[in-house]
């Protein structure tokens, strides 16, 4: 029995279809942003717990980075969704992190977490969500109001619209 339904046979020319799904982790309340590290493990954001988890196939989940989306939990304006979300690596193995609580994109080199993009036109970002690093190093990310109070745009503090940036 195949684990997915195939509607167009042509898809087999582009993706593997001979696989079985495997549950790697079920201990998170809301996880997002999975990314594969070439050293042989997965990272993912556990948003409400404000951590990035690490899964090495065949081993239990471990914490890779704490305070991944919000560095000052006491002052978080997004208490339920303050953690990181989207994750992406660049060619130099830096991890770029969408930070809901800090309203920013951070850069992590494996030792130091630093703010990378903190605002646009002198206003904080809303709630950076998904991120991709292109071959040339360009960074693309989305910035919807997810996590903001009632998921509403708040132009006096943050961006006046949900945006997509490069």
Model-predicted segments: where are they?
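Sequence-structural signature of mature extracellular/luminal beta-sheet repeat domains
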Residues: 1-166
């Amino acid at each position: 029995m195949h684990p997915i339904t195939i509607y167009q046979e042509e898809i087999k020319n582009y993706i593997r279809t001979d696989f079985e799904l495997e549950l790697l982790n079920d201990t998170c309340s809301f996880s997002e942003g999975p990314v594969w590290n070439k050293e042989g493990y997965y990272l993912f954001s556990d948003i409400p717990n404000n951590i990035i988890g690490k899964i090495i196939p065949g081993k239990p989940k471990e914490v890779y980075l704490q305070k991944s989306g919000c560095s000052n939990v006491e002052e978080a304006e997004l208490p339920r969704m303050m953690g990181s979300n989207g994750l992406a690596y660049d060619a130099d193995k830096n991890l770029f992190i969408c930070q809901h609580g800090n309203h920013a994109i951070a850069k992590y080199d494996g030792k130091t977490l630093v703010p990378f993009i903190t605002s646009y036109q002198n206003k904080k970002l809303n709630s950076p969500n998904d991120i991709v690093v292109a071959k040339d190093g360009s960074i693309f990310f989305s910035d919807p109001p997810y996590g903001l109070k009632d998921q509403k745009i708040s132009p006096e503090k943050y961006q006046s619209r949900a945006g997509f940036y490069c």
